[in-house]
Amino acid sequence: MFKEAKLALEDGTIIRGEAFGSETVKTGEVVFATGMTGYVESLTDPSYRGQILMPTYPLQGNYGVTEEWYQSDGIKAEGLIVREMCPAPSHSLSEKTLPEFLEEYGIPGIAGVDTRALTIKIRDKGTMKGALATEEIDDDELLEMAVKQPDITEIDLVDMVCVREPVILNEDASGRVVIVDCGIKRNSIDALLEKDLGVVIVPYTTSPAEIMDYEPDGLLISSGPGDPTRVRDAIDTVKALSERLPIFGICLGQQIIALAFGARIYKMKFGHRGVNQPVKDLRSGTVSITSQNHGFTVDPDSVKGTDIEITQLNLNDGTPEGIEHRELPVFSVQYHPEAGPGPHDTVNIFDRLWMF
């Protein structure tokens, strides 16, 4: 039975389609992600908190859902926009359908949308605030919700997705990495555990002294959602520990490291989200295909005169994809070397943290 869903954008556009998932209304920043697969990993990626996700590939849900692919403890995106929803998934590991998955976590979905046209609109005008309704609501009321919601730069999204208490894994390992959790993905944790490292995951508000009590051999500043300037505690941690520990940053972690050493960050027009972003290493000349999910990036001009340098660039738009301190063992990447979803071209970068 067809049930209408509506998506309102802050520019006044109302898009109608077929509802699936939970019967509710959600607001968020409407973003698109490129890639033919990976909807489970993307929906459960904490970096999508505060955002309504639109995959550009037209068919979604065709291989179902299994918890094995989760990148956190559940869906973190606010909603899902698709061209076509597959009603009968086929995969040996599938435990539930995509609509059932969304309903389980109270998330609305809309199908039958011209996602190509909406992607072009966002590409040309930039990301927009939106409101997605799968329950009855007046168009004007829905549009008002889209327009009046706080900007993503005004919300402490990291606080919504980080751990509340420290988590210790593989405690008896000979080496130990502390993860400053801003929205860590499971694949990042697994990448460290596969190196037989001990892992301690702490809230981003944990003080430098408390971190050092764990006697770590290295520090990982994790990926996560939102505006890095709001994660002041993590910035201060990098400043305090950069001369005492090797530090590695992923995605939001790169932005936090850049801010700690005096560079600036800016919000991108529509960001990088997907599994096919080409990145060039400026030292080796090699090019890797990477998985990315970020709406902020380092201002390359602001790096001049600081103690950090740009080591990798995005080949699509020239934005910084890697930075490194000129003297200290501090480095970072803007992409996701752990994949989940996406290619594993750069997963060996975790080895470098241990080499330090």
Curated annotation (Swiss-Prot):
Keywords: Amino-acid biosynthesis, Arginine biosynthesis, ATP-binding, Glutamine amidotransferase, Ligase, Nucleotide-binding, Pyrimidine biosynthesis
Glutamine amidotransferase type-1 domain span: 176-356
Enzyme Commission code: 6.3.5.5
Binding site for L-glutamine: S47, G224, G226, L252, Q255, N293, G295, F296
Region (CPSase): 1-176
SMART domains: CPSase_sm_chain
GO molecular function terms listed in the Swiss-Prot or TrEMBL record: ATP binding; carbamoyl-phosphate synthase (glutamine-hydrolyzing) activity; glutaminase activity
Pathway(s) the chain acts in: Amino-acid biosynthesis; L-arginine biosynthesis; carbamoyl phosphate from bicarbonate: step 1/1; Pyrimidine metabolism; UMP biosynthesis via de novo pathway; (S)-dihydroorotate from bicarbonate: step 1/3
Active-site annotation: C251 (nucleophile), H336, E338
Biological process (GO), any one: glutamine metabolic process
Domain of life: Archaea
Catalytic reaction equation(s): hydrogencarbonate + L-glutamine + 2 ATP + H2O = carbamoyl phosphate + L-glutamate + 2 ADP + phosphate + 2 H(+)
Subunit record text: Composed of two chains; the small (or glutamine) chain promotes the hydrolysis of glutamine to ammonia, which is used by the large (or ammonia) chain to synthesize carbamoyl phosphate. Tetramer of heterodimers (alpha,beta)4.
PANTHER family per record: CARBAMOYL-PHOSPHATE SYNTHASE SMALL CHAIN, MULTIFUNCTIONAL TRYPTOPHAN BIOSYNTHESIS PROTEIN-RELATED
Similarity section: Belongs to the CarA family.
Protein name: Carbamoyl phosphate synthase small chain
Organism field: Methanothermobacter thermautotrophicus (strain ATCC 29096 / DSM 1053 / JCM 10044 / NBRC 100330 / Delta H)
Encoding gene per record: carA
